[in-house]
Amino acid sequence: MPSLAKQSLIRLLITTLVIFSLTGCDYMQSLVGGGDETTNTAETPKELVTLSLAVAPYIGWMPWHLANEEGAFQEYRDTHNIDVQFVSSDYASTIRKFINREVQAVVISNIDAIAHFVREDVEADVILVMGYSNGNEAVLISPDVDHFDIRGKEIALSQNSSRHYLLDRYLIKNQIDFDSVSIQNTRDIDIPTMFVSGKMYGVVAGNPNAAKLLNEQQAQLMFDSRRIPHEIMYLLVARREVLQENPFFSKVLLSAWFSVVERLQGSRKASTIRAMAQLAVIDPDNFTNQLNTVELNDTPIKSLSAIRNDRLMRRAMRHIRYFVERHELTGSEPFTSWVSYPGRTPALIHFNAKPLQSYVTQIR
């Protein structure tokens, strides 16, 4: 048996190799001058800078709300002259606020980011892949239906969203013609009412609406995002020019996120779940069940691996591109200008690994 000292040394060497394997490409890229990513040389502003983050109160995004409740965003206010304001609003409003420059960062799905930001020519950096939908969105059918046949039926959903994408993927997988299904464009907050009205054959909902309809209205599950793993991603996005002018902004955001999610795998998991459930106004067991439908990247190393996994993102992008182009969501912008990956010249939406890479290096 090796000594404790040798075991500790081995663990340190393994961790160092993992970090280097994840960050080395970016480092070599910077040596040869490739790419044009936002750097993360965080210098403290001379005067107080006020920036803001908008997050909808979805279950998988409640760590942000708890971080705000615990004062995580204000940790660097006095020492680094950066005041991060937290804005909680419905999902559509958070997206609109980001586009209108009312907030500088937003939590959003990859599909919604492309659908909304590319057409508006918004230059934005993805600095965190928080996780993936793993059952968090679902196609739900009335409990009175005894045979699933969606052809010729009407479905309520938020058009051109990740829920719309999920329905398209169901139709493709089951070789059902798109035109055989009618879409009733419905705001997410109105989905439960539309389902209960009985006017629709079904709805496409995300949690907490999906869980509510399954539990309280005996909705039947026809299809959910577990069938398309890692295609619907949840992202932390910031305006590129803001990150360039205020590189410390990313550290505040990343610190706030990990201050909560890292507790979900340790002895403080139960108390953290209870705190988030209280903010979401549901019981802890229900909260846990809904949280399990989101595959979280709950450590900095796991998150860095995710944002650098361009192979996974490119594979998902093949399906997303078809959806976006079929619905003409990006206007005249060519596909090559939509999304770019770490170490490449930034497109409109750029997966920028440097802030997270810097964060990982600093916490070791």
Per-range role (PLM):
Residues 71-80, 227-228, 299-312:
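Short, solvent-exposed loop/beta-turn-alpha elements that line the ligand-binding surface or hinge
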Residues 246-331:
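Secondary-structure end/capping motifs
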Residues 112, 184, 189-281:
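Pocket-lining segment of extracytoplasmic ligand-binding domains
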Residues 2-13:
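Bacterial N-terminal signal peptides that target proteins for export
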Residues 28-185, 201-207, 220-222, 230:
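Short, glycine-/small- and polar/acidic-enriched structural segments
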Residues 22-24:
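C-terminal motif of bacterial Sec signal peptides marking the signal peptidase cleavage site
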Residues 320-364:
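Conserved C-terminal helix/tail region of periplasmic/extracytoplasmic solute-binding proteins
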Residues 68, 72, 93, 97, ...:
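Extracytoplasmic/secreted proteins, especially bacterial periplasmic and envelope-associated proteins
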